[in-house]
């Protein structure tokens, strides 16, 4: 926990935005949480509870909430964006003219820009210009557990080492460890791909295929992360750390994961629409699967698990057919000889 205090604007009043805003406020930083839903934001500000996304969990009395974006970012030392990936570009555009001089921008959004498949740091850099410090906050972290003060470890990767350290220091505390790095491509890749792979393990568990199948899918899913990382310039150690393996294991095994729950529902025979309606929150994997496969096709590599998830989500094949295709694939060495060279 840093001895220095910062005024921080957290944009996005969903479960993860609320959890991070509460964490920062508890660490003594004047924190403002911005959201679009006036009724929900008013309730958070008055009652210090996000009854929709984190019911029954008390938020710090010092945490303020507002729907006024200009007021939220005014005089902010830095800004933390925590919105779904489909809203990321719009949010960055909104804050670009409002951002105080010198304020860095970090985000805990996971995914790619829908439609273009661009990494979020590319989107932010394009809109904000070359001089704004940027950082991505990622790693294995369920919002509910963070808000309850349970032990958590995350990582902050940035293109400005000093800013990444500022963000990590503000978050780091007695039960929340924050590491740093400078591989934004790898950090964002891990955070996006794990959502797709969590659907695969959820489907397998929904079909009651056993723990062996789950372990196999997680491990071969990591293989797919590493293969894509190798061709886009990410470092393998990033994917073997909190941003990759850590987030992958949590999202594939923890029932608080929306993407795993989507897979469970599909594996039990529910339709995609039924499953999303039952979850009641944004499920990033539906769009992210398309963008992952766009990247794979552009670079000419095979990602069979991710491709099967994409096909199931689009209704092109059933989960049973996807499983059959994966099991029928030609045998080959576990890792290409050139993967780590």
Swiss-Prot record:
Pathway as given in its UniProt record: Membrane lipid metabolism; glycerophospholipid metabolism
Gene3D superfamilies: N-(1-d-carboxylethyl)-l-norvaline Dehydrogenase, domain 2, NAD(P)-binding Rossmann-like Domain
Reactions it catalyzes: sn-glycerol 3-phosphate + NAD(+) = dihydroxyacetone phosphate + NADH + H(+); sn-glycerol 3-phosphate + NADP(+) = dihydroxyacetone phosphate + NADPH + H(+)
Binding site for sn-glycerol 3-phosphate: 110, 139, 141, 194, 247, 257-259
GO MF, one example: NAD binding
Active site: 194
Compartment list: Cytoplasm
Signal peptide start and end residues: none
Source taxon at top rank: Bacteria
PROSITE patterns: NAD_G3PDH
EC annotation from Swiss-Prot or TrEMBL: 1.1.1.94
Residue positions binding NADPH: 15-16, 36, 110, 143, 258, 282, 284
Main location: cytoplasm
GO biological process: carbohydrate metabolic process; glycerol-3-phosphate biosynthetic process; glycerol-3-phosphate catabolic process; glycerophospholipid biosynthetic process
Alphabetically ordered keywords of this record: Cytoplasm, Lipid biosynthesis, Lipid metabolism, NAD, NADP, Nucleotide-binding, Oxidoreductase, Phospholipid biosynthesis, Phospholipid metabolism
Record-linked Pfam families: NAD_Gly3P_dh_C, NAD_Gly3P_dh_N
Enzyme class of the recorded protein, top EC level: oxidoreductase
GO CC, one annotated term: cytosol
UniProt keyword annotation of Transmembrane helix present: no
InterPro entries linked: 6-PGluconate_DH-like_C_sf (IPR008927), 6PGD_dom2 (IPR013328), G3P_DH_NAD-dep (IPR006168), G3P_DH_NAD-dep_C (IPR006109), G3P_DH_NAD-dep_N (IPR011128), NAD(P)-bd_dom_sf (IPR036291)
NCBIfam families: PRK00094.1-2, PRK00094.1-4
Family, per entry: Belongs to the NAD-dependent glycerol-3-phosphate dehydrogenase family.
Biological role: Catalyzes the reduction of the glycolytic intermediate dihydroxyacetone phosphate (DHAP) to sn-glycerol 3-phosphate (G3P), the key precursor for phospholipid synthesis.
Protein name, per record: Glycerol-3-phosphate dehydrogenase [NAD(P)+]
Organism expressing this protein natively: Xanthomonas axonopodis pv. citri (strain 306)
Primary gene name: gpsA
